[in-house]
Amino acid sequence: MKGFFAGLICLLTLLQPKPVNAQTDSACRFRISVLTCSPGDDLYSLFGHNALRIIDTIKRTDIIYNWGTFDFYDPDFYPKFVRGKLLYSLEPQILPGFLQEYQEEGRSVMEQVLDLSCEEKMEIKKAVDINMIGDNRFYKYDFLLDNCTTRIRDILQKNIKGINEPVPLVPAGTTFRDMIHAYLDQGSQPWSKLGIDILLGSKIDRPVTNTEAMFLPDFLMKGIDSAKVNGNSTVITKQLILDAKPRVEMQGIYKPLMIIGIICLVLFLISFLKTPAIITVIKFTDTLLVLVTGLIGLLILFMWFFTDHWSCDNNYNIAWALPTNFIAAFATWKRPQWIRKYFKVAVVLMGLLLITWFWIPQEMNIAIAPFCLYMFYRYIELSRSKKI
């Protein structure tokens, strides 16, 4: 009997779980990879996308963790979007559903399978699981500092031990604006580029760090490719799981600089023709342009002071898009004495902007230059007597 109990105790001892080893074995069942989706043709998809893929080889699950979803049917969607208060969320997806959208749009998806220790796999899975709990799924989206790419970047940096800084991903001195411009140029979006340059202020004209450069999906992929742990690559395999259709380059000739330049040149030349019809046209365009610049200035002020978009702060475009022009426009046609004094101040401000164009701490879109030159000339004329 004693032998029976001794054997039973021995058997139960052997069957006792080994917490550390079991935990390690459990963690090793995960296969973790980063998916990088190529840029699309539309502005919202122009910069690409990232997601995290976790395969559980024991439970046989294959989950895509996507930090790029939002509720388009929220009744306050547009006000929240404009004011920078829109919440994005982490959503789990299955691979076929995730790939379907990119397949329909002809975009590629690249997978980098990460070389991780069992402990690192466990910590990354734990971090994702915590992100999936309740309100943790939601975050206030920031295109430059907190997006679907930076969320993955931060999880990897926090949970991969001894990971080295990747090689320089961009040339020294590259700014956020430079990186945005590269994609807008590649995607043939000159008018979007103009609009973005008008709305985004000088805060995005500082050089980015290597970590900050990984706010864009392609640069996160490059960063992962070049990062090392104890001298070894962080990537086991890199494979194309969805091929892209060749992109058709849309090189339109109607670029903002050319269009704005031609319009301003024509207006400048015809302003010397003193026929009644031309005088009426010039007075109308003066009123219209002063009104439009005033509206743009009010929009700049709103984005600067009444939204959470930090990238719209300190916007030097307000030097030519004077918010007060919105009021001045209604007095431009008849030009009373006070409005002529107002335009003298506008002449000084526009002149200072043109003189310091290449030295102010904000890169101005070159397409604005001919417009500013023309408005400088018109402000001079409007500051004089009523005669054109």
What are these regions (language model features)?
Residues 1-24, 387-388:
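Bacterial Sec-dependent N-terminal signal peptides
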Residues 8, 23-27, 34, 136-138:
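Internal catalytic domains of large membrane-associated glycosyltransferases
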Residues 23-25, 56-61, 116-120:
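A short, structured loop/turn motif at beta-sheet edges
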Residues 28-106:
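Glycine-rich catalytic cores of cysteine/serine-nucleophile enzymes that process amide/ester linkages
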Residues 49, 62, 111-113, 149, ...:
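Extracellular structured ligand-interaction cores
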Residues 71-146, 150-160:
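A cross-kingdom signal targeting lumenal/periplasmic-facing segments of multi-pass membrane
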Residues 130-330, 337-340, 348-388:
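Activation targets extended, charge/polar-rich intrinsically disordered C-terminal tails
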